[in-house]
Amino acid sequence: MRHHRYNPDFNFVVEPEDFNKYSDKELLQYCLGATMYMPGIKDFTMKILNKEMLGLTSMVFCFEDACSEELVQAAEQNVLHVLDALSTALDTGVVTYDYLPLIFCRVRNQQQFEHFAEQLTPHHVKVLTGFNFPKFNAHNAEVYLYYLQKLNDKFGEIIYGMPIIEDPEVAYRESRISELVGIKKILDKYKEIILQVRVGATDFSSCFGVRRGVDYSIYDIMTVREILADIVNLFGRNNDYVISGPVWEYFRVSKQMMFETLPTHNIDDCLMKRIPIVNNEIDGLLREVILDKANGFVGRTVIHPSHIKYVNALQAVTKEEYNDAVSILGSEKGGVFKGECGNKMNEVKPHTTWAQKIYMRSRGYGVIENENDFINLFSEK
C-alpha cells in the first residue's frame, strides 16, 4: 500500500513509501493512518479488489460492537471467506501486496478470539495483519497476548496485536494508574508483536454520561482528556508505543464534497478561526486530528469512508518539520542550533524523540511544502 494514491498528481517534496504487512515494524506501526472499522458480517471482497474505498490502507473486521451476538458465527465464516478470496487473488496475480490493505479482526472476547483463530489456515494468515483486542485490561492482557504469540509460532508468520484501552478501570481516577502500569508491564513482555496501542474514547465518555458534539473535540471533554493524557504519559514515553487517536462519530453523506474555492489561509488557521473548509462534520474531524498530532497520537480509528483521506492527509509532514527533524537526527555534536526557517530553536537532546516521530511519519505519509498543501492534498483538484 501507499498513502494518498487517490491524488496521483500531487507534488510531494518527499514521496511516501510503500508498505505491507511484512514491512519492518518500526515503519509499519506509523503507517496505519485512518483505520476503518467494518462489520464482520459484510463481504467486502470486491470493494477491496476493485479499490472502491478511496484511500483505504488499513481496515478492521469487527466481531464486537458492529456485530450482534447471534451473528458472530456467520461473521466468522464471512471473514474467513474474505481472507480466503483475497489470498487466492494474491496467488493468482489479481492483486499484489502493494494494493492490499492491512487487515485486522476486532474480536469479541478471549473465547471468540480463540474460536476464530482455530479456524485460520496459512492461506488466511498471509493476508491477515493482526487482531484488535477490545476492553483490554491487566486481567485479560496475558490471555490475549499469550495466545497471539502461540499463533505467531504456529504459522511462522507475523500476526500483530493492537490492544484497545477503553476499560472503566482506566476511566476511573482511583484505579487508572495502577491499571495502566499493569497493562504496560504485560505489553512490554510481548512488545515485538504489538503494532499500536489504541484508545476507546466513546467507551470512556459513556462512563461519565457525556458525548462530544460536532463543534467540540474529545479534548474538550475534561474527564476523557485526563484519561488520554495518562495513556500517552505511560505508553508514549520515548516513542515506546505508537498510540492512535479515537474515533470521530460525525459524518455527512454527500454526493459531492469538492472544493470550488480553496481557502487561502493555512489549515490550522482556518480551523481554529472556524473558517469553513468542507462541512461541520469534516471540519470537526480535522480540528481533532490537529490536536491528536499536537498530543502525540498517530492516525486514528474511522467509521466512515469519507474520513479516510482527511485523516491520512494530515499525517503528512511539512518540509520545515522534516528538515528540522533530519537536522536534529543527523547532528553529531548535539547542542542547540537555529531551525530550518530561522524561526525556532532546535535542541538536539530534548527534541530527538520528536524528530524520530516526524521522520517516521514522513516515510509513511510523505513530505509536503507547507501547511497550505494539506488542503491541496485532500482536495483532489
Model-derived features with residue positions:
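Expand to "…catalyze enediolate/carbanion chemistry for C-C bond making/breaking, isomerization
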Residues: M1-K381
